């Protein structure tokens, strides 16, 4: 599996699925899945326990596949590529927005 070009903290837009068109910030990335703030929310019913004496209904985000989100820069979606730049310790690989050519990080 290829490495994910989306990183934690990126602004993304959902391009496929039931939440298509929604935007949010990436909370976490793991195994090709991303957790996006306010997107793909599920309802969990928790039973009362010693740790959670009240129990109840919890709403939380569920992971979606990284291929279903696109990076958002200046209000527009763009693909992400990689390039190398010269640094003080040799060359460094950085992410680049394909639409504008701007370095992301």
Swiss-Prot record:
Keywords for the protein's UniProt record, in alphabetical order: Ribonucleoprotein, Ribosomal protein, RNA-binding, rRNA-binding
Function: One of two assembly initiator proteins, it binds directly to the 5'-end of the 23S rRNA, where it nucleates assembly of the 50S subunit. One of the proteins that surrounds the polypeptide exit tunnel on the outside of the subunit.
GO biological process per UniProt: translation
A GO molecular-function annotation: structural constituent of ribosome
One GO cellular component term: ribosome
Family as reported in the entry's similarity comment: Belongs to the universal ribosomal protein uL24 family.
Gene3D superfamilies: 2.30.30.30
InterPro entries, per the entry: KOW (IPR005824), Rib_uL2_dom2 (IPR014722), Ribosomal_uL24 (IPR003256), Ribosomal_uL24_CS (IPR005825), Ribosomal_uL24_KOW (IPR041988), Translation_prot_SH3-like_sf (IPR008991)
Name listed for the protein in its UniProt record: Large ribosomal subunit protein uL24
Subunit structure: Part of the 50S ribosomal subunit.
């Amino acid at each position: 599996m290829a490495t994910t070009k989306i990183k934690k903290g990126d602004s993304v837009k959902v391009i496929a699925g039931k939440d298509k068109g929604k935007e949010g910030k990436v909370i976490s990335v793991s195994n090709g899945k991303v957790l996006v703030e306010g997107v793909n929310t599920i309802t969990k019913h928790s039973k009362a326990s010693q740790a959670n004496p009240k129990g109840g209904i919890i709403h939380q985000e569920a992971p979606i596949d990284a291929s279903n989100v696109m990076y958002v820069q200046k209000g527009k979606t763009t693909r992400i590529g990689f390039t190398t730049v010269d640094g003080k310790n040799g060359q460094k690989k950085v992410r680049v927005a394909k639409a504008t050519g701007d370095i992301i990080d």
